[in-house]
Amino acid sequence: MRTPPSTPAPEPEPAPVPVRARTGARLRAGDSVPVRTLDPVVGPPLVVPDSGRVVHVQFRRFAGCPVCNLHLRSVARRHEEIERAGIREVVFFHSPAEELREHVAHLPFAVVADPRKELYTAFGVEAHRRSLLDPRGWPGIVRGVCGGVVELLRGRGRLPAADQPGGRTGLPADFLIAPDGRITAAKYGEHVYDQWSVDELLALAAGPGPTDG
């Protein structure tokens, strides 16, 4: 009598690996990002993730963007409070460093130029007409333009360049990155002024766990 062939033992399942940033795809809380050394337009190089504190990464539009400036002024006013909460601010613009520097040199946190949008792509940050067409963003646009005029009259502001190779329809995005590289919170804006407020940022950094939105 012929002995039936034995059934081979199933191969063990591979061990799970950490989720890494997916190029061009939206990132979620729980994903992780690789270590990168960045060169701000003012100040020394910095490393993200930061081994000693949480990093708040913001993606904005172009140098001199009135809506971006409106929001960043609110961040600058409370920067000491943000730092006391153990949060480091890092802001990206898609303008060249030379152009960006004259607009942001006064800010108390790191600002990084990414004219090729390499980090925008890595974090899945998009541009779309709805950034300007969504009525929810219009109050921010009006306040940003009016605030920009006041800054110009005071001799502290600068007009943005007429030509914007990176476009004018970028959508904002916010990420909280833990020291181990995990994203603990992420938000992709639905219009030009859809980002975390400082109060929301502080609450998320002190919160119990990962969140999207």
Placement of each model-derived feature along the sequence:
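N-terminal "domain-start" segment that seeds a small globular fold
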Residues: R2-V48, S74
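Conserved beta-strand and immediately adjacent loop positions that scaffold enzyme active sites
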Residues: V35, V55, A173
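Short active-site neighborhood of thiol/selenol oxidoreductases, capturing the structured segment around
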Residues: V47-A76, E89-F92
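Residue-level preference for short coil/turn positions at secondary-structure junctions
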Residues: S51-G52, A85, G170
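Structural microenvironment flanking redox-active thiols in thiol-disulfide oxidoreductases
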Residues: H71-A122
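Thiol/selenol-based redox catalytic cores and closely related redox-interacting motifs
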Residues: D114-Y193
